[in-house]
C-alpha cells in the first residue's frame, strides 16, 4: 500500500526530446505545448535549458520536466549521462519535411538511447512527426517528404506510439506528451508493485 501511496503523490517525470536537426521544429513544439504560443522562428536558446509543465493524466497531476536535446550534450560523458541516465522517457521528433531528421533518429539517436539509457526509460518512447513550419519549410515545402507509412510501420514494429502533430494549427500537440507520461506512470506502477 505504501508504494501505491507514493505514486499518488506529486510525480515529476524527466522527458528528453530527441531530434536536434533544425527542421524538427522542437522549439516551436515546446513553445506551443508549454506557453500555448506558436512561432515559426523561435529564438535560439544558449546553454542548458528545460521547460516545465503540469498535465493531468488519468486524474493525476504530473509535472513534466522537458529537456530538449542539444547537439552539444554528447560532447562529454557527464553531459551524456545526465541526458540519458536521468531520463524517464523520450519524445523522438522528426520533421515531416526532412528525411534526414528521421534517418538521424534511427541511425544515431536510437543507438545512443540503447547504449546509454537506463532500462526503464528505454521502454518509454513516443515517435512524433512534426509538421512545423520552420524557416526552411515555411511556405517552401508544403508536402510531406517523409513517408508516414514507413515511419508508422517502424513505430509499430517497435511498439512505439506514433503521433502526427502541427503546432501552428494546434493539432495533436498535447497528445504525445500525455501518452509518454501515461507510459512512464504505468511502468512506474508496475515496477512499484514488484
Swiss-Prot record:
This is Ras-related protein RabU. One of its GO terms (biological process) is intracellular protein transport. The gene is rabU. A motif (Effector region) lies at residues 42-50. Keywords: GTP-binding, Nucleotide-binding. SUPFAM superfamilies: P-loop containing nucleoside triphosphate hydrolases. InterPro entries: P-loop_NTPase (IPR027417), Small_GTPase (IPR001806), Small_GTPase_Rab (IPR050305). Signal peptide: none annotated. GO terms for cellular component: endomembrane system. Belongs to the small GTPase superfamily. Rab family. GO terms for molecular function: GTP binding; GTPase activity. GTP binds at residues 19-27, 68-72, 130-133.
